[in-house]
């Protein structure tokens, strides 16, 4: 185990000397596909946008509960962790600003100034994200209420908050102590800080040779992924506990699963563990890549069960669970014509490319990466009906506040 669960309850969760370089390497290249091309995250995050809107009431309830117990400061600071490079992060922030402003107004107080931090790994395409930001609301442009009434998300004419980017991993400290009122992280915590060490070790019982994901893997591989998720989430919680203001709140949503078996990753398994896996096997059989090259690639994603998530939060002890649910979401495939197999195939390939394309290209190069996604598109088109009918995600949705 690369990061000991035994230290989860302590002040710090330690990282082994061997693990640190691997974490740094992954952090230097892991990101959603930047830019605005066909395979970019910007143009393939519609599913995340739909899922976020379905969870809107959970976020609003989190903010309402926070405002009941917090003081009315002149500055309100929010941080979105794992912001990526699409407009979904801006939508979340607009909801926060709107809801908090309404709470101040209901108390007969002027709305505070808002400071928002957008945080992701240094490899993230912050330029694309910040190009989506509307200009800052000028004093002569109208009231906060007028600005908020102008629209939501990237369509807002101006923004009523100061914005800044914070590059770094959320599995460590990012902000000064007691400086953040509300944290949000949507669709990011299922990304691990690293592929578990033993999964790539051919001498280990947990070696995942022949496979590129934990779905349908051996019990030992699944256990290694589970331990990595537990250790990562513990480190995340300890860092946020130091950075959150007393009375603050944290809203989290990540991929989850309904099965008690870690090797049954549900919708994530269909995304990465079936046709994506088969596309890798195609390249090996065709001699495009060597088997060892496939065997050394693993997707660093883990969809936890509700109980696994709850166990880590309780073991850490820094946070009280205000709400924790497993919510059935929709499909990651957003298509206009679900009966069009070619369109479904393209959507599947682009969805995988948007979230894993950078890792694939770093491992086998852009040319062979393009060949991989071509194989994936063809396979997905042949199984379009099954994908449309069966592919849906579950999400762990959680609201936390600092424990008394």
Swiss-Prot record:
Family under the similarity heading: Belongs to the methyltransferase superfamily. SABATH family.
InterPro entries on file: MeTrfase_7, MeTrfase_capping, SAM-dependent_MTases_sf
Catalytic activity field: (indol-3-yl)acetate + S-adenosyl-L-methionine = methyl (indol-3-yl)acetate + S-adenosyl-L-homocysteine
Biological role stated in the UniProt entry: Catalyzes the methylation of the free carboxyl end of the plant hormone indole-3-acetic acid (IAA). Converts IAA to IAA methyl ester (MeIAA). Regulates IAA activities by IAA methylation. Methylation of IAA plays an important role in regulating plant development and auxin homeostasis. MeIAA seems to be an inactive form of IAA.
Oligomeric and partner information: Homodimer.
Keyword line: Magnesium, Metal-binding, Methyltransferase, S-adenosyl-L-methionine, Transferase
EC class name: transferase
Molecular function per GO: indole acetic acid carboxyl methyltransferase activity; indole-3-acetate carboxyl methyltransferase activity; metal ion binding; S-adenosylmethionine-dependent methyltransferase activity
Residues that, per the record, bind S-adenosyl-L-methionine: 82-83, 88, 120, 169-171, 186-188
EC number, UniProt record: 2.1.1.278
Residues engaged in binding Mg(2+): 208, 212, 294-295, 297-298
Cofactor note: Binds 1 Mg(2+) ion per subunit.
Necessary cofactors: Mg(2+)
Keyword presence, Metal-binding: yes
Protein name per Swiss-Prot or TrEMBL: Indole-3-acetate O-methyltransferase 1
GO BP, one annotated term: methylation
Tissue expr: Expressed in roots and panicles.
Pfam families: Methyltransf_7 (PF03492)
Gene assigned in the entry: IAMT1
pH dependence statement: Optimum pH is 7.5.
